[in-house]
């Protein structure tokens, strides 16, 4: 396990966040792929390991307690490493899909200290892009942080449907809470957020903790309206 933790720390991504971003990353759930296999945390995709070039890939499932439009968020970075320990490809999640993380001007990887991918988070929404210029072409990127804040209430993914529950009242409370407490105007100035190594964990550990994390925030929201 210690070897795995050292590996996870060695390739941990640097997330560039807006200076006014109201949410922080509180955990990364990690999976090391040494062969082609379907992702458990991003079930719509298979992580393909071309053994001629790739020794392993690390999936970082990035946890936020909130998205600016709904309760809780999970984004992903995939780092592909060759047999010499060099990063040869980086992908990251973008609104349910994924993009290659390369410099838009020269197509090269963007790495800090040679092994840490640098990616940019859409303000409030946290979709990941390789260049902050891309954010301005995303529909409603600004409105989602202001008048559209909280619009989606509590999201309940199928894998947690038996442990996270919502209703019409909670949906309305969550929308109002997010808009009142977290609504903001992005600065479009970005600063690095690097998660402490002790907050790296296996995906299974993070997955097991998610219902408790979400239900704690639901309790905070309910308290907000019943002071």
What do these predicted regions represent?
Residues 4-90, 98-99:
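Short N-terminal edge-element motif at the start of the domain
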Residues 71-76, 83-227:
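Domain-length functional cores that host ligand/cofactor binding and catalytic or interaction surfaces
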């Amino acid at each position: 396990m210690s070897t795995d933790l050292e590996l996870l720390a060695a390739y941990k991504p640097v997330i560039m966040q807006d200076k006014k971003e109201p949410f922080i990353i509180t955990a990364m759930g990690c999976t090391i792929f040494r062969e082609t296999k379907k992702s458990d945390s991003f079930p719509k995709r298979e992580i393909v390991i071309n053994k001629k070039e790739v020794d392993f890939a690390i999936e970082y499932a990035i946890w936020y307690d909130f998205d600016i439009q709904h309760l809780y968020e999970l984004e992903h970075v995939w780092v592909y490493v060759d047999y010499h320990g060099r990063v040869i490809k980086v992908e990251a999640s973008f609104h349910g899909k994924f993009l290659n993380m390369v410099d838009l001007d020269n197509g090269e990887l963007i790495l800090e200290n040679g092994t840490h991918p640098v990616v940019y988070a859409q303000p409030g929404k946290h979709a990941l892009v390789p260049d902050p210029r891309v954010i301005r072409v995303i529909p409603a990127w600004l409105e989602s942080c202001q008048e559209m804040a909280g619009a989606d209430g509590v999201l309940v993914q199928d894998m947690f449907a038996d442990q996270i529950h919502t209703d019409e009242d909670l949906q309305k409370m969550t929308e109002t809470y997010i808009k009142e407490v977290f609504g903001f105007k992005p600065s479009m100035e970005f600063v690095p957020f690097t998660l402490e190594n002790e907050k790296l964990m296996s995906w299974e550990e993070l997955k097991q903790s998610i219902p408790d994390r979400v239900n704690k925030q639901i309790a905070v929201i309910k308290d907000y309206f019943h002071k």
